[in-house]
């Protein structure tokens, strides 16, 4: 099903993610550091049940991803607190997928659980008379990433796994600066350009902005490792925080002010 969700401002989503981290830190008597212990937060603190399974088989949905790879990576039953993550993301079987797994867990157990479980009853009541087998409240497919319900959960996951304060501190430690980096700062750097070319080749990308993304991801990569997320997830977060800029901000004109 597609869950109908209201608009929520970015800062409200980020505040809730920060509140969850603060609640967890207080309950455990710990200081939050990267990488964020997302499994402990979801399973021990929020007390949600997490399983791995072949989601396409479980939900009886044919595969439609590129090369028939899975395009359903997570599902959550908001009425029972059950999360199923596709077995293709199992970090014990596929260590290279750990970043994607952690983000999916934060997306389901953070984003959907914290933001959307209060919306379940009205939607469930309309389906109850027709459902023989309980279906997940939200099925997360890569093809639906731009839907509001998915965007909100994605943004929540990024705030939860990459908290603003910790990312800014890591940025300063790694780069020795608090100011943002411009795309134009990176292009003359031969080493960075070479690394970007390697990333593009590895990803098999041909989009117009692939080079720019790869340049930013070459900067984001060591920070991503520290936080246990993918290069792309960290690049997006750094751009959202204004630490990576594609164009130089325009100075505000004083015309009409003086």
Roles of regions detected by a PLM:
Residues 1-258:
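Active-site hotspot residues in diverse enzymes, especially metal/ion-binding acidic/histidine motifs
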